[in-house]
């Protein structure tokens, strides 16, 4: 059956009777917020997201308290054939955690964490945010790799330890039929393979168990340069990446950004330096960046958890509407193309003036992905196992009337990059990837994008989708059509 027809056929919940809602409420410990019953304040709080573009007006939102609540919600969804979305904390630029019809299952109250220092693991419930896990780990001198865990999870420890998905030991899940299972190398190994990259297609994880690592203080510094040094910054990006690769432990990581820092009237290039070690060594490795003469320098030695906080130069009141896209670039990076892209981004910023100027940014991710690339492409569902750079234009604005325009502008930049990559490659494809491969955290949405994210693993995923979700209940993020 066509997936769009399968989704559209789902009930929006408007026909639910009062007795249906009462039955749901009496079966769970959590709270049901009903669109036409709750106060405006209560309902708005239930559907608000970090990205206001992602707000959808669901018929009901259920704040679950435990795993059994989730089971009852899934049973209710099946009984009434409702559309359903799952919200862990709602902090994502895409709207996969929202539903314009049916039910949202909100995991935000499920935030328990336990650390097993002897086994070097941490167990965290599905509603946890990064700091819920980072702080108890930090107290034990430990850390884990974190990122957008509904897909793969990339962080500044990825160079040393791989993706969050590569450090997943096991997961407890509620499947589409309401069954609770454990997925690991030893139990339901096919499901475990699938959720490491395609998790939103297969169920709701109530509990993750991750491998953790010993962790001390790190060096974390942001260098901003005057606008006229954009070309100089671009001229050292290949050198900085090569320095990162030379550190075999993956401890030295660099990112470039192009944004308007607080107190400045226009875009400035910047380099973010991370080193999992002492300041003296960090500055030695990053010498080319300091030699350019930064306009300002902030940061230094800090705890690892400090690196995951939103930095002051990205904190702005309002501007709570987001659009981001991504495209990969092969090394050695084409400096002329990078300057083209930064110029396109600057033109967009200047075109829309005060709507975009301060919070918007363009990021060039130069982090070392050799550890990620060392894992065979068929070892997990995620197929993006290669060491490339990622260009990520990210626009923020505050006027809802500009939503579609901003989405068009941001995707036009990455479309240009992909076209240039295609031109450079011609008909040649290196291994299992192609010129359209995308960064899943940024480019969620739609079956076509699923093909790019999962590549040669998609046929197997479609077979597993038929096994674990034949009725296409889980149809958000990167919806995989059952075989």
UniProtKB/Swiss-Prot annotation:
It holds the Pfam family FAD_binding_4. Keywords: FAD, Flavoprotein, Oxidoreductase. Its EC number is 1.1.1.-. InterPro entries: FAD-bd_PCMH (IPR016166), FAD-bd_PCMH-like_sf (IPR036318), FAD-bd_PCMH_sub1 (IPR016167), FAD-bd_PCMH_sub2 (IPR016169), FAD-linked_Oxidoreductase (IPR050416), Oxid_FAD_bind_N (IPR006094). Induction: Expression is significantly up-regulated at the end of late growth phase, in the presence of Butyrolactone I. Expression is positively regulated by the pgm cluster-specific transcription factor pgmR. Gene3D superfamilies: 3.30.465.10, 3.40.462.20, Uridine Diphospho-n-acetylenolpyruvylglucosamine Reductase, domain 2. Disruption phenotype: Only abolishes the production of pleosporalin A but not of the 2 other final products. It comes from the Eukaryota. Its cofactor is FAD. Residues 54-215 form the FAD-binding PCMH-type domain. Pathway: Pigment biosynthesis; Secondary metabolite biosynthesis. One of its GO terms (molecular function) is FAD binding. FAD-linked oxidoreductase; part of the gene cluster that mediates the biosynthesis of pleosporalin A, ascomycone A, as well as a third cryptic naphthoquinone derived pigment, all responsible for the coloration of conidia. Essential for the production of pleosporalin A, but not the 2 other final products. The pathway begins with the biosynthesis of the cyclized heptaketide 3-acetonyl-1,6,8-trihydroxy-2-naphthaldehyde by the NR-PKS pgmA. Belongs to the oxygen-dependent FAD-linked oxidoreductase family. This is FAD-linked oxidoreductase pgmH. The lineage of its organism: Eukaryota, Fungi, Dikarya, Ascomycota, Pezizomycotina. The gene is pgmH.
């Amino acid at each position: 059956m066509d997936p769009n027809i399968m989704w559209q056929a789902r009930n929006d919940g408007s026909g639910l009777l009062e007795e249906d809602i009462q039955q749901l409420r009496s079966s769970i410990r959590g709270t049901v917020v009903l669109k036409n019953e709750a106060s405006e304040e209560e309902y708005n709080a239930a559907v608000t997201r970090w990205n206001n573009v992602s707000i959808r007006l669901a018929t009901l939102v259920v704040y679950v308290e435990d795993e059994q609540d989730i089971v009852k919600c899934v049973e209710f969804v099946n009984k009434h054939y409702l559309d359903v979305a799952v919200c862990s904390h709602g902090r994502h630029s895409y709207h996969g955690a929202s539903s314009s019809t049916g039910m949202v299952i909100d995991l935000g109250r499920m935030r328990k964490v336990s650390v097993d220092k002897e086994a070097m693991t941490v167990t965290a419930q599905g509603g946890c945010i990064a700091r819920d896990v980072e702080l108890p780990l930090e107290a034990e001198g430990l850390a884990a790799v974190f990122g957008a865990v509904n897909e793969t999870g990339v962080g500044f420890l990825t160079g040393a330890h791989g993706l969050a998905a590569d450090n997943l030991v096991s997961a407890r899940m509620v499947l589409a039929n309401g069954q609770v299972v454990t997925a690991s190398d030893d139990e339901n190994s096919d499901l475990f393979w699938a959720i490491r990259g395609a998790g939103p297609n297969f169920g709701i994880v109530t509990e993750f168990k991750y491998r953790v690592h010993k962790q001390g203080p790190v060096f974390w510094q942001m260098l901003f340069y005057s606008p006229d040094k954009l070309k100089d910054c671009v001229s050292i990006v290949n050198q900085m990446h090569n320095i990162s690769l030379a550190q075999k432990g993956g401890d030295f990581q660099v990112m470039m950004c192009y944004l308007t820092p607080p107190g400045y009237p226009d875009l400035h290039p910047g380099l973010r330096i991370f080193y999992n070690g002492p300041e003296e060594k960090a500055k030695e490795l990053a010498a080319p960046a300091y030699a350019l003469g930064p306009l300002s320098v902030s940061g230094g030695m800090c705890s690892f958890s400090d690196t995951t906080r939103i930095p002051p130069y990205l904190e702005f009141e309002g501007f709570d509407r987001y659009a981001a896209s991504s495209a990969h670039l092969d090394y050695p990076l084409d400096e002329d193309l990078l300057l083209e892209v930064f110029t396109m981004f600057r033109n967009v910023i200047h075109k829309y003036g005060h709507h975009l100027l301060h919070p918007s940014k363009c990021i060039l991710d130069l982090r070392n992905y050799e550890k990620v690339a060392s894992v065979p492409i068929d070892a997990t569902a995620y197929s993006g196992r290669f060491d490339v750079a990622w260009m990520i234009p990210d626009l923020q604005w505050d006027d809802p009337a500009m939503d579609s325009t901003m989405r068009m502008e941001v995707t036009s930049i990455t479309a240009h990059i992909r076209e240039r990559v295609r031109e450079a490659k011609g008909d040649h494809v290196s291994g299992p990837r192609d010129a359209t491969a995308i960064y899943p955290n940024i480019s969620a949405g739609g079956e076509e994008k699923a093909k790019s994210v999962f590549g040669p693993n998609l046929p197997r995923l479609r077979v597993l989708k038929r096994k674990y979700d034949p009725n296409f209940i889980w149809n958000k993020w990167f919806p995989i059509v059952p075989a």
